[in-house]
Design a protein with these regions (language model features):
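Iron-sulfur-associated redox domains of electron-transfer enzymes in respiratory
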Residues: 2-240
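Short, well-structured alpha-helical interface segments that form or flank functional binding sites
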Residues: 116, 247, 251-257, 261-264
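Active-site-flanking alpha-helical
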Residues: 126, 267-271, 346
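Functionally engaged cysteine thiol sites
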Residues: 155-169, 269-275, 283, 294
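Histidine- and/or cysteine-centered catalytic micro-motif in compact active-site loops
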Residues: 194, 261, 267-274, 299
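Oxyanion-binding "anion nests"
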Residues: 231-239, 256-267
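Ferredoxin-type iron-sulfur electron-transfer modules in oxidoreductases and energy-metabolism complexes
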Residues: 233-254, 272-363
């Protein structure tokens, strides 16, 4: 949980969050850093843990390990796979079994990692994942990895597929240790946690000038005006609750391949499957947890051969209902508007178009 901070090097420099984001105005510690100091910040972060950030690979970006600031793209829009891959592994063994020795739970021994350059939508998605994997029934693997992660957010410019503004996730109020806002000739740093404050001690930072704070406010207003897509998010509960059997879905269901790509790239999809494997000698085995997708026919298959979502249509509508729900802990929608499902859909199905079209047909 974020702890609001009081001072930096003995100076009180609380600054109220900007009124452009009036939903949760609090008081955070703001500092200004020249861009020539970024390399020194990276070195400080390297001392905390292994560095990971947005690296361009071909046409797309991926969160990968990096050593130099020159290896990452600070102007990226989105990665293909979200940062959840660091906390819920796509595939991992969680238990080993031996016929004579019994079973052994495989404990996590994570290294400390720094995730540098996360955008607000992904930070808000991680808050949702935290509420699922930590708040009620803690998952020891996830929780330990989160404890050993340091989150550095980075401001971004939306492209034509971003709709996080419609979902209320275009700004991160918490969920990070540090957040960097690019104001052209410098960065404004919002400090989110005590350990974030401790890490930046010794850097050449200063209290932001009035001119710098005006640049920050202006850049946030400009960014807010750049979103092209708009989802009628106030109607999402109605879509989820009452439109399951509407014929308005049919056009998109017919185009859908049922491949599950949208769930794999979604930063809040968290379904997994647990399987057990035994060696041919029948003496050794292990239990494996891996990502699953509600778009796959096997996902809803239960004992006796019953499948409670047997058709692609059932699975298609189910996913949109799931993403339209609101997380009761964070009060955020399960869709954070990152645009990944649209960008990486092989059938070119547009998430916003689907929901706006369905609502438009029946309203």
């Amino acid at each position: 949980m974020t702890k609001f901070l009081s001072s930096y090097n003995g100076r009180n420099i609380y600054i109220k969050d900007f009124s452009i984001h009036p939903r949760r105005c609090g008081r955070l510690l703001y500092l200004e850093m020249g861009k020539d100091e970024l390399a020194n910040l990276i070195e400080k972060l390297r001392g905390w843990g292994e560095l990971h950030g947005p690296v361009k690979k071909g046409k797309f970006h991926s969160f990968e390990r990096f050593d130099s600031i020159d290896e990452i793209d600070l102007n990226y829009t989105r990665t293909m796979i979200p940062p959840k891959k660091y906390f819920t592994r796509p595939r991992e063994a969680i238990m080993r079994v031996n016929l004579r020795k019994g079973y052994e739970l495989l404990e996590e021994d994570p290294k400390r990692i720094v995730l540098f350059g996360l955008h607000a939508c992904d930070i808000n998605a991680m808050k949702i994942m935290d509420s699922i994997y930590i708040d009620e029934f803690p998952d020891p693997y996830y929780a330990e990895r989160r404890r050993n992660s340091f989150i550095v957010g980075l401001s971004c410019i939306p492209d034509e597929e971003c709709f996080c503004k419609s979902m209320g996730t275009d700004y991160a109020y918490d969920g990070f240790d540090l957040f960097l806002h690019d104001i052209g000739d410098a960065y404004i740093i919002r400090v989110g946690t005590e350990r974030g404050l401790e890490l930046i001690r010794g850097l050449d930072l200063r209290k932001p000038s009035k001119d710098s704070l005006k640049k920050l406010a202006d850049s946030e207003r400009k960014r807010s005006s750049m979103f092209k897509k708009e989802l009628l998010s106030s109607h999402l509960p109605d879509i989820a609750d009452s439109l399951h059997d509407s014929d308005a879905w049919k056009e998109y269901i017919d185009r859908c391949l049922g491949c599950g790509s949208c769930t794999l790239v979604c930063p809040t999809c968290r379904c997994y499957d647990v399987s057990e494997y035994v060696d041919l000698n029948m003496e050794n085995g292990f239990r494996m947890r891996r990502w699953d997708s509600c778009f796959l026919r096997s996902h809803a298959l239960v004992a006796g051969g019953l499948n409670f979502r047997p058709t692609r249509a059932d699975r298609f509508v189910h996913r949109y209902n799931c993403k339209s729900a609101v997380n009761r802990v964070t009060n955020l929608p399960y869709c954070v508007g990152c645009g990944r499902c649209t960008v990486f859909c092989p059938a070119e199905i547009d998430h916003v178009e689907v929901l706006n079209s369905v609502w438009g047909v029946v309203r």
